[in-house]
From Swiss-Prot:
The lineage of its organism: Bacteria, Pseudomonadati, Pseudomonadota, Gammaproteobacteria, Pseudomonadales. This is Glutaminase. Substrate binds at S61, N111, E155, N162, Y186, Y238, V256. Its EC number is 3.5.1.2. The gene is glsA. It comes from Pseudomonas syringae pv. syringae (strain B728a). GO terms for molecular function: glutaminase activity.
């Protein structure tokens, strides 16, 4: 596996320069674009990594999975009364579909859906940002994980579209908390700073029937883990989920920080990072690396 990861990074490195960093979030626009890392965490506890796998980056929308898992833990099936688990086929920050469907987001991985999940969690936790941070620390076994306040503040200063989604949902009585408070928590979640190894470990429970080896806790039931994986497979890469399924064939979740996490059920969790994005907001080189890895070891679930 180690030789394979090194080989794959060498093969995809020439693609660097073809994408663009997420400069609409000023703090992310400062990230050096030519970085590339990958990590694989097996269910047997082995970790393999290559490239810039130990360089921390902003996880952004990857955090939506952690938020969803927290909500499932404390509210179970009730959460689906306020949002769906269908693909949207729209950009992740679209307001058109949200208006048309009366403030009920299609799934928890578009921005509106993630805001509903944060609204649900906000009512359950006294300190939502700290609760999220501590949860992620347990999942990856790294007590040093923190949220980058510079990134969170940068996103909050450019919150208009997310605020619009929240207020639109509030007009349909599908958003109950204080919009500004929920937005601050949401951006702190997105601004969590982790590296590929951290994220591969943190997502290990989804490859292991909901069991986290680091903390020894059953994070989700096996059935719930399967359900989360299914939503990742259909909605985890914005409006490019179909292309990811075609090319990689695994449940995945991306973020505009350039990270992509993929789950190989019963076998491993993988994280790749390259900050240059394609037109859909997903890591251009990261997707190419995952496509090669999945093909070489026959990991597609299809």
């Amino acid at each position: 596996m180690q030789d394979l990861l090194n080989e794959i990074l060498d093969e995809v490195r020439p693609l660097l320069g073809q994408g663009k960093v997420a400069d609409y979030i000023p703090a992310l626009g400062e990230v050096r674009p030519d970085q590339l890392g990958i990590a694989v965490y097996g269910n047997d506890g082995q970790v393999f990594s290559a490239g810039d796998a130990e360089t921390a980056f902003s996880i952004q929308s990857i955090s939506k999975v952690f938020s969803l898992v927290q909500a499932i833990n404390h509210s179970g099936e009730e959460i689906w009364q306020r949002l769906g688990h269908e693909p949207s086929g729209q950009p992740f920050n679209s307001l058109v579909q949200l208006e048309f469907e009366q403030g009920r987001p299609r799934n928890p991985f578009i921005n509106a859906g993630a805001l509903v999940i944060c609204d649900i969690n906000q009512a359950r936790f006294a300190a939502p940002s700290l609760s999220m941070r501590d949860f992620v620390r347990r999942l990856c076994g790294n007590r040093a994980i923190t949220s980058d306040s510079k990134v969170a503040d940068s996103e909050y200063q450019h919150r208009s579209r997310n605020a619009a989604a929240a207020y639109l949902m509030k007009s349909f009585d599908n958003f109950h908390g204080d919009v500004e408070d929920v937005l601050r928590s949401y951006f702190h979640h997105c601004a969590l700073s982790m590296n590929c190894i951290d994220l591969a470990k943190a997502f290990g429970f989804l490859a292991h029937q909901g069991f986290c080896a680091h903390s020894g806790e059953q994070v989700l039931t096996a059935r719930q883990a399967t359900q989360v994986n299914s939503i990742m497979a259909t909605s985890g890469l914005y409006d490019e989920a179909g292309n990811f399924a075609y090319r990689v064939g695994l449940p995945g979740k991306s973020g505009v920080g350039g990270g992509i996490v993929a789950i190989v059920p019963e076998r491993a969790s993988v994280c790749v990072w390259s900050p240059e994005l394609n037109a859909a907001g997903n890591s251009l080189v990261g997707m190419a690396a995952l496509e090669k890895l999945s093909a070489r070891v026959d990991w597609s679930v299809f």
